[in-house]
Amino acid sequence: MSETSPKLRAELEGIPTYKPGKPAAAAGPVAYKLSSNENPYPPLPGVLESVASSVGSFNRYPDMACSGLMSELSERFGVPLSHLATGTGSVGVAQQLLQATSGPGDEVIYAWRSFEAYPIITQVSGATSVQVPLTPGDVHDLDAMADAITDRTRLIFVCNPNNPTGTVVRRAELERFLDRVPSDVLVVLDEAYREFIRDPEVPDGVAIYRERPNVCVLRTFSKAYGLAGLRVGFAIAHEPVAAALRKTAVPFGVSQLAQDAAVASLRAEDELLGRVGALVCERQRVVASLREQGWTVPETQANFVWLRLGERTLDFAAACEQAGVVVRPFAGEGVRVTVGENEANDIFLKVTERFRKEL
C-alpha cells in the first residue's frame, strides 16, 4: 500500500484550532462555567414545547429554506425575505460570507484581539488576515482599520460589542469609518451581543444596513435567546450579499429543532429580554465590585467582563477553577468572564478580591 497521503491545501497547516470555553469540571461540590458567554437561564417552557413537537420528525430533513424562521425575522426586523440568510450560528454565517467574498490574494480586516474565529475562518477561505490592534482602551481603532484598506481588501469585520473585551463602537465613529470604506468592500457588523447593549450611542446595525448597501449585520440566537446548543444565526444584508449567503449555506445545516426553537423564542421575546435585563443588572454589579476592588475594567456592553492580567493570566484562571468557576483565559493577555448565575459571580468576585491583594 502506498505511503503517500492525500494532498491537502497548504494553507490549512497553519490554522490554529478553535478553543471553546473550558467545561466546568468539578473542582468542588459545584462548578460553574463562565467561559463561553452562555445564557445561564434554561430555555423557556414554550421553547421546550416547540422543540418537543419536532422530536417525532427526526427521520425527515429540516426545511432547507428555514421558511417559518425567515418569515418571523422578516416581520420582526421589517426587512424583505430576500435580505435574509440563515446559518449554523453567526459564526457559520460569517464563514459563508468569506466563502462568498474572499479567496487567495484577498485581505480581510478585523480588530485584534477580537472574536478568535475570525483568523481561523479567514485562513480556511484562503484569504489573508489583516489584524489591527485595539486601542489602549481595548476599543476598535477604526481610523487604523480604515488606513489598512487596500485594493485587495474584500471584507471587514466590526465586532460590536467586541468579544472578548465587551467594548463598543458608537454611532459617530462608525459612520465616519464607513464613509472611508470603498463601496465594493463588505463591512460585517457582528452583533452577537446586541441585546445586552444599554449605551444609547451604540447604533443598531440594522439601521445602518438600511442606509448602506455594503453593510451586513450578523445576529445569533446563541446568547440572549439561550439557544447556543442548537446553532442558529442569521444575516441581514442587501440582496446580492444575502443571495450569495444562501448559495454558500450548508444544505439542511439548520436543524428543524433549531428553527422551531428560534421561532418560539422570537414569539416570547419580551420574556426573554426580561431575562437579559436581569443579566445586565448583574453585569453592572460585577463591574462595580471589580472597580471597588481596584481593577481596571473596560466599559462592557456584553454579557461578560474582560480583565487584563498579562503574565498572571493562567495563574488567575487556575485560581478561579480551584474555587469552582471556569473562565476563559487568553495566555499573556487576560481573561474573559461570563456574567452567569449570581452564585457563580459571587465566587468569581471572591477570587478577584484575593488575587488583587497578591498583585
UniProtKB/Swiss-Prot annotation:
Belongs to the class-II pyridoxal-phosphate-dependent aminotransferase family. InterPro entries: Aminotrans_II_pyridoxalP_BS (IPR001917), Aminotransferase_I/II_large (IPR004839), ArAT (IPR024892), HisP_aminotrans (IPR005861), HistidinolP_aminotransfase (IPR050106), PyrdxlP-dep_Trfase (IPR015424), PyrdxlP-dep_Trfase_major (IPR015421), PyrdxlP-dep_Trfase_small (IPR015422). Gene3D superfamilies: Aspartate Aminotransferase, domain 1, Type I PLP-dependent aspartate aminotransferase-like (Major domain). The modification N6-(pyridoxal phosphate)lysine is found at residue 223. One of its GO terms (molecular function) is pyridoxal phosphate binding. The gene is pat. It comes from Streptomyces avermitilis (strain ATCC 31267 / DSM 46492 / JCM 5070 / NBRC 14893 / NCIMB 12804 / NRRL 8165 / MA-4680). It is an enzyme of class 2 (transferase). Homodimer. PANTHER family: HISTIDINOL-PHOSPHATE AMINOTRANSFERASE (PTHR43643:SF3), HISTIDINOL-PHOSPHATE AMINOTRANSFERASE 2 (PTHR43643). Pfam families: Aminotran_1_2. It comes from the Bacteria. It catalyses: an aromatic L-alpha-amino acid + 2-oxoglutarate = an aromatic oxo-acid + L-glutamate. Its cofactor is pyridoxal 5'-phosphate. This is Aromatic amino acid aminotransferase. One of its GO terms (biological process) is L-histidine biosynthetic process. Its EC number is 2.6.1.57. SUPFAM superfamilies: PLP-dependent transferases (SSF53383). Aminotransferase that catalyzes the conversion of aromatic amino acids and 2-oxoglutarate into corresponding aromatic oxo acids and L-glutamate.
